[in-house]
From Swiss-Prot:
Glycosyltransferase listed as a keyword: no
Family named by the database record: Belongs to the universal ribosomal protein uS14 family.
Described function: Binds 16S rRNA, required for the assembly of 30S particles and may also be responsible for determining the conformation of the 16S rRNA at the A site.
Record gene name: rpsN
Region called Disordered, residue ranges: 29-73
The protein, known as: Small ribosomal subunit protein uS14A
Residue spans of biased composition, Basic and acidic residues class: 61-70
GO terms for MF: rRNA binding; structural constituent of ribosome
Protein species of origin: Mycolicibacterium gilvum (strain PYR-GCK)
InterPro entries tied to this protein: Ribosomal_uS14, Ribosomal_uS14_bac/plastid
Keywords, alphabetical: Ribonucleoprotein, Ribosomal protein, RNA-binding, rRNA-binding
UniProt-listed NCBIfam families: PRK08881.1
SUPFAM superfamilies referenced in this protein's UniProt entry, alphabetically: Glucocorticoid receptor-like (DNA-binding domain)
Amino acid sequence: MAKNSKIVKNERRLVLVARHAERRAELKAIISSPSTPADARAAAQSELNRQPRDASPVRVRNRDAVDGRPRGHLRKFGLSRMRVRELAHRGQLPGVRKSSW
């Protein structure tokens, strides 16, 4: 079980990323466009740097939906590898079967 503070901090980051996503995309388009003048590009870069650090999507950590474990996360299920194994053995994941060959 992850610390509650870490889980809450990650949820706050998710909200911040969603709030700033549109403006970040606009600024990144201005910065990466070759037709943008140098002064406009510099202004866009400056504004992007002034945005909160946690508004960047790379700072969000995928966590287990049940207990918040940060490692061994499987995107398909939104769970950690251990939780997937546990639920699959119990038959609580629809369509998941133990492989045998």
